[in-house]
């Protein structure tokens, strides 16, 4: 499972990279995101109707060399403004709720059971599920409702990699703070750290990495450089074009760039050991 210290840390991109890497290694792999908020949709035809899932999960499916499946994104929230969202469950939207009502009467009662049902179904069909978290797992005001992060990791006994964006500053504080804010029973699921979007000589980070590893008791598996690539974003405010406007060949080339960069800058053997995969 890929979680981040914040929104925009690079979770989606890392899942894209890992989907392609594990597909290249011969594994049958599927992406999954329990809950996503976006207006960037991908439409899947199912039971003679079109159902909606987040566009970024469709890109991740492409990286895994499989067809997008509505089960990859059970809960989709489409922001409508004025604290109101359309709630799309299993690709079907027929409910509009405020954030307060969503957390009070929907997320645990209806959303999470659907998440577990779809995830269990996908697990039976794949060697590996790469779960993307949402935002930060340490939003302590939402810990009891955060089905996209540690509630799901705890329920499924998932191994978590924590990714932080160093470009925006405050990376090391965000890493340590995120891990320290997690309850002890959830903290144990974090198995490693990824520093993302780095520019410069990696050696300048050596002392800081040693200190972070000592404070968190977790290894920094990789420092991923910031590179130019062109892949659709999940952010509803992002202006990148939709997946449908990318040619298959071009998108595949961009996915390979991301995967190659991750592979070259990450301790892949350590990652495989975490997952108990050869």
Briefly describe each language-model feature range.
Residues 1-278:
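Flexible phosphate-sensing "switch/lid" loops adjacent to ATP/NTP-binding sites
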């Amino acid at each position: 499972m890929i979680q981040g210290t914040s929104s925009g840390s690079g979770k989606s991109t890392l899942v894209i990279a890992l989907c392609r890497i594990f597909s290249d290694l011969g594994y049958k792999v599927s992406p999954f995101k329990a809950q996503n908020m976006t207006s960037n949709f991908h439409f899947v035809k199912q039971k003679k109707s079109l159902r909606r899932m987040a566009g970024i999960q469709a890109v991740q499916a492409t990286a895994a060399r499989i067809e997008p499946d509505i089960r990859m994104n059970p809960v989709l929230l489409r922001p409508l403004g004025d604290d109101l969202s359309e709630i799309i469950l299993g690709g079907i939207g027929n409910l509009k709720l405020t954030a307060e009502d969503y957390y009070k009467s929907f997320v645990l009662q209806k959303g999470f059971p659907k998440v577990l049902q779809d995830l269990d179904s996908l697990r039976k069909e794949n060697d590996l599920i790469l779960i993307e978290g949402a935002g930060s797992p340490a939003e302590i005001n939402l810990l009891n409702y955060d089905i996209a992060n540690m509630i799901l990791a705890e329920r499924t006994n998932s191994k978590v990699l924590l990714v932080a964006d160093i470009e925006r500053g405050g990376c090391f504080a965000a890493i340590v703070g995120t891990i320290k804010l997690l309850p002890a029973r959830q903290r144990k699921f974090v198995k490693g750290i990824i520093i993302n979007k780095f520019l410069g000589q990696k050696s300048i980070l050596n002392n800081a990495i040693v200190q972070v590893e000592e404070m968190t008791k977790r290894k920094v598996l990789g420092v991923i450089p910031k590179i130019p690539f062109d892949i659709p974003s999940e952010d509803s405010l992002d202006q990148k074009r939709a997946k449908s406007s990318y040619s298959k060949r071009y998108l595949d080339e961009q996915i390979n760039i991301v995967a190659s960069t991750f592979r070259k800058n990450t301790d892949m053997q350590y990652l495989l050991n975490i997952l108990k995969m050869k």
